């Protein structure tokens, strides 16, 4: 899907994410793993909020996303901040870069948006293909627990000064959650409705680790969200840190 409607409201709905704090966490994570950022890719960068936070910290970073609408927002925001950041439109599973990278980050459950297991494996292989030896791949995912116990078949309502959003979930087999969003925006006393639908899939820690190893990575750690501790049983987000050690898919 293109996220053409969702892109208009993404930053409003994600305003409590805390991108500065998340960028601080990523920087500390890299220090703890004795890794210098070098050339960094923000994979599935969305509207570029985290990309810009890291760029402002001096990280040599560029962003890739499959949504033209998301990238349009990212480019406009970067321009307004006076940041010269390269943004490219590509899918994760068909990643094709101009050169190698030292670091790849992929945050805020972007991996979950790939609902085909083979495509996740392909995305890992493409990151590995362009990753320098000893490069670090850091990503997070919504957990199976979150899909089954939190998202499940529940409905959520989000209200801000700009938009009213109804978020409806339908949990299917293989831990796939179909998400239907209805946005209501007021203009001159009249409410206008727009809708967007997409799906996410929960993957087990074991399956993601297997796919990383098959792509040539060595798993260094799995943390709870914004933490350096072992994840709890009811953790809603996992953070994976893997290092490129055994490139085995250079013909992918």
Predicted regions and their residues:
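SAM-dependent methyltransferase
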Residues: 118, 138-211
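Class I SAM-dependent methyltransferase SAM/SAH-binding core
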Residues: 41, 49-94
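C-terminal lobe and adjacent flexible extensions of AdoMet/dcAdoMet transferase-like proteins
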Residues: 205-252
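Conserved class I S-adenosyl-L-methionine
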Residues: 1-38
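A short acidic, Gly/Pro-enriched loop at the edge of an enzyme's catalytic core
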Residues: 96-103
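A short glycine-rich, Lys/Arg-flanked "PGG" loop and its adjoining helix->strand segment in the class I
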Residues: 121-133
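Conserved glycine-rich SAM-binding loop
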Residues: 46
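Residues lining the SAM
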Residues: 107-109
